[in-house]
């Protein structure tokens, strides 16, 4: 039932009527629209997208602002975007979207020679993300894979502007990183200037 202080459609009507219309105030104007009840079927495709986007969004927790890493990343973040949205877009461009992106990110992180991604990721506050209705076998992106995604994004930014990230560990190719490089990377994400 809509709440009113005057005839319906005037002043401040709010609420729904007959499961068909919704009255509300938007930007100071009284508005009416059809009632839409969103569906959440939790399909496999939806799970894959939520898993990848959710994990990449969570990875932002590892970055302290300001930090040395953040300052360099902000330099190449496109105007009108946050560094997080630029990172998500870039990582999807690197690994792919949906189930393809999840599988590629997990494979890249698992195939990396440094073995301390998980330990370091836990140390910077990252946690695994699991979505049970995503593609079977690819229902989790670990904290270490989230940290690896930021590292891959970093090297992509460095390729576009070599003057950025001109320090260790970024002078070593990501594929050649060892445990000390991963630890140094996490420190760069967290070091306040």
Spans of model-derived segments:
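Charged linear interaction tracts used for macromolecular binding and regulation
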Residues: 75-193
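Long, polar/Ser/Thr-enriched low-complexity segments
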Residues: 1-118
